[in-house]
Amino acid sequence: MIVRTLAEAEASDRRVTSENWESVRLLLKDDNMGFSFHITTIFEGADFEMHYKNHLESVFCMSGEGEVETLADGKVYPIKPGTIYILDKHDKHVLRATKEMKMACVFNPPVTGKEVHDESGAYPLEAEAIVD
């Protein structure tokens, strides 16, 4: 059994910060569960494009407000607490936060730990692993 607290993870290398977000990676590839689980904060005013070419992601909004736009068809979906969006087709998308958003995110395949978006908006398939 693996037991971790959010507070412990926030105070460790499992907390990864970028310009638009901060992600606390609670479950990673080395945990051998077949997916990774993150609590991610999207900063207020963030507006950025992503394209997970190597991963599928589902995102559940716990707090805050914003929107996600799928670039293939230009559809815009509001995000508020209780909303889930699922990037089941490696959807190229834009995420915008009108208020800081706290999100629960699941990635398949799992991330290794220190991934940040590359110039195309994707995470690499393999990155440096976090070692506890």
Swiss-Prot record:
Catalysed reaction equations from the record: (2S)-4-acetamido-2-aminobutanoate = L-ectoine + H2O
Protein name from the UniProt record: L-ectoine synthase
Gene Ontology biological process terms, A to Z: ectoine biosynthetic process
Keywords (A to Z) from UniProt: Lyase
Coiled-coil ranges per UniProt: none
Biological or metabolic pathway of the protein: Amine and polyamine biosynthesis; ectoine biosynthesis; L-ectoine from L-aspartate 4-semialdehyde: step 3/3
A matching Pfam family: Ectoine_synth
Function as written in the Swiss-Prot or TrEMBL entry: Catalyzes the circularization of gamma-N-acetyl-alpha,gamma-diaminobutyric acid (ADABA) to ectoine (1,4,5,6-tetrahydro-2-methyl-4-pyrimidine carboxylic acid), which is an excellent osmoprotectant.
Enzyme Commission code(s) on record: 4.2.1.108
This protein's encoding gene: ectC
Any GO molecular function: ectoine synthase activity
Family from the record: Belongs to the ectoine synthase family.
Source taxon at top rank: Bacteria
Keyword Lyase belongs to the record: yes
Zinc among keywords: no
Species this protein is from: Saccharophagus degradans (strain 2-40 / ATCC 43961 / DSM 17024)
Gene3D superfamilies cross-referenced by the UniProt entry: Jelly Rolls
InterPro entries named in the record: Ectoine_synth, RmlC-like_jellyroll, RmlC_Cupin_sf
NCBIfam families: PRK13290.1
